[in-house]
């Protein structure tokens, strides 16, 4: 046994594919529907989707080399794309049989197998290089084939995509608000945190005082977690209405 990590993840992946549903099918969105496993969707040429999983299982028993880890990365990426494609094709077939009201969603098996594919790919990338930038590129490129598959329209019959189409405007508005909050807090944190980090690193005299202040500041999220900031924030929002417009209100 050469790589216990890949072997364990592959065995779990095969177990998830055999025991859990890949997609859930419902005649409409008012009923829960039933799970459909890989065995019902794999037929004919689709059986070739099993080859990447079998390849991963075989490679976990051979001596590891950079070339073999590259093959593991490609197999995990191909399997992930294949699972997504199969779910989309299954949704298209079920929609053709049942009409526009049917709903086909990802099942627990898909989510678990997708997560395991990403873990296998991350393990391979970590073995291929220790450079953080190259690791980020290796893990980031996993999403490119998925984005192309999404843009091709092969996934349009999945309930997730149908819901997105019906509520695209709301989705884009919420996404914009979340990104504004994210970068609106990240930017000042970086502008303040990076200079303070340099000061703490270079000046032993300022370090204790800065750490004392920062330790007090970092307790604020814990205080907010227990709802102890609801009353002060509500008072501030009542005193200065412009704070309410920025999202400050009855929240911890």
PLM feature spans:
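Membrane-water interface segments at the C-terminal ends of transmembrane alpha-helices
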Residues: 173-252
């Amino acid at each position: 046994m050469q790589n216990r990590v890949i072997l364990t993840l592959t065995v779990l992946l095969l177990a998830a594919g055999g025991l859990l549903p890949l997609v859930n099918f419902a005649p409409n969105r008012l009923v829960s529907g039933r799970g459909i496993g890989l065995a019902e969707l794999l037929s004919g040429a689709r059986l070739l989707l099993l080859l990447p999983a079998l390849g991963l299982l075989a490679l976990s028993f051979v001596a590891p080399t950079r070339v073999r880890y590259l093959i593991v990365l490609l197999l995990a990426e191909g399997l992930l794309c294949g699972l997504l494609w199969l779910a989309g094709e299954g949704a298209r077939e079920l929609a053709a049989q049942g009409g526009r009201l049917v709903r086909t969603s990802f099942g627990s098996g898909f989510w678990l197998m997708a997560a395991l594919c990403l873990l296998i790919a991350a393990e391979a990338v970590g073995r291929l290089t220790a450079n953080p930038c190259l690791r980020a590129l290796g893990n980031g490129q996993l999403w490119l084939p998925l984005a192309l598959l999404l843009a091709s329209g092969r996934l349009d019959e999945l309930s997730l995509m149908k819901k997105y189409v019906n509520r695209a405007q709301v989705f884009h508005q919420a996404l914009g608000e979340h990104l504004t909050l994210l970068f609106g807090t990240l930017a000042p944190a970086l502008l303040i945190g990076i200079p303070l980090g340099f000061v703490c690193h270079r000046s032993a005299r300022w370090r204790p005082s800065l750490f004392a202040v920062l330790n007090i500041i970092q307790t604020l999220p814990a205080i907010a977690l227990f709802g102890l900031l609801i009353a002060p924030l509500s008072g501030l929002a009542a005193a200065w209405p412009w704070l309410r417009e920025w999202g400050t209100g009855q929240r911890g």
